[in-house]
Amino acid sequence: XSNATDETXLKDVSA
């Protein structure tokens, strides 16, 4: 990822 969400724990934006 790239977004903060992905950094925290791989959310929807995990591709």
UniProtKB/Swiss-Prot annotation:
Catalytic activity field: a ubiquinone + NADH + 5 H(+)(in) = a ubiquinol + NAD(+) + 4 H(+)(out)
Coiled-coil portions: none
Major enzyme class: translocase
Annotated signal peptide: none
Cellular localisation: Mitochondrion inner membrane
Keywords, comma-separated and alphabetical: Membrane, Mitochondrion, Mitochondrion inner membrane, NAD, Oxidoreductase, Translocase, Ubiquinone
EC number: 7.1.1.2
GO molecular function: NADH dehydrogenase (ubiquinone) activity
Domain of life of the organism encoding this protein: Eukaryota
Membrane topology: Peripheral membrane protein
GO cellular component: mitochondrial inner membrane
SUBUNIT field: Complex I is composed of about 45 different subunits.
Purpose: Transfer of electrons from NADH to the respiratory chain. The immediate electron acceptor for the enzyme is believed to be ubiquinone.
Name of the protein described by the UniProt record: NADH-ubiquinone oxidoreductase 20 kDa subunit
